[in-house]
C-alpha cells in the first residue's frame, strides 16, 4: 500500500467513476483499475461495488475511506510542518444554518484572509447530517448542537443559543406547550436537534403538535408563521437577523428548555493544522479549546 494508491482510491470514491477519477489524478484509467485491484487484494476485501460503468463504496470501502482521508491529510500536514509553511490543504466545514448565518461570517472572512493556501468549503444542514459528514470523513469539522457522547468524536463548546417560540401576531403569550397544543409547526427534518427539542417540549407538557411541516430554511419557517399558518422554534440570534421578525410574536421557552449549546466537533485524532488555525479564530475561552474526549 502506498500514498499513490490512497490518492487514487479517494479520487474514485469521490467521482464514482474510473474515467473521471483518472482525469483528476492525471493517470490513464487502466492504471487506476490495476492499482485499485492491487489494493483490494492486499487488504483482502472489495472496496467498491461495481455496477456497469459506475462504482460505489462497499461497507468496507466506507470504513477504509475515513482512514485514507486522514492519512493523506496527515501527510500534507507533515509536509507543511517540515517545510515551515503556513497551514494549507483542504478544510471542509459543516454548520447549522443559524450558525453559518449569524455566528461565523466574520470568522470565515478572517480565516480566508489569513490562510489563502487553505482550500476551504462550507456546507450547511441539520445536526444529524453534519455529524454523519464528520464521522464519514466528508467534513473535517462541523458546528452542531451538543455535546455529543460518541467515542469517535472530539469537540469544544462555542455558542449558547436562546430558543424562541415564534407565533403569528396577536397570539397570547406562550409559556408552556399546552397553550399551543395541536398547533401546526414548521421545522427542519427529523434529524435536526432543534426539531427534536421542540417535540420534546410538547411531550413533556402532555401536549403534541399538529401537522409537522418540514422546511429547508428559517426564512421559509418565518414566512409561514407571518402568514398565520403555524408556529416555529427559532434561535433568537437567527430570528433577529431576518427581515420580517417584527411581524411575529416571540416567546422564550421556560428556563429548562430555553438554552442549547452549539459545539464544534471533529473526528478524534483528526485535529489538523487548518482546523487548529480555525479554532484559534473562534471567540471561545482558552479553557474550552481543549474540548472533551
From Swiss-Prot:
Residues 18-38 bind DNA. Residues 1-58 form the HTH lysR-type domain. InterPro entries: LysR_subst-bd, Tscrpt_reg_HTH_LysR, WH-like_DNA-bd_sf, WH_DNA-bd_sf. Pfam families: HTH_1 (PF00126), LysR_substrate (PF03466). It comes from the Bacteria. Keywords: DNA-binding, Transcription, Transcription regulation. One of its GO terms (molecular function) is transcription cis-regulatory region binding. PROSITE patterns: HTH_LYSR. GO terms for biological process: regulation of DNA-templated transcription. Belongs to the LysR transcriptional regulatory family. This is Uncharacterized HTH-type transcriptional regulator YneJ. It comes from Escherichia coli (strain K12). The lineage of its organism: Bacteria, Pseudomonadati, Pseudomonadota, Gammaproteobacteria, Enterobacterales.
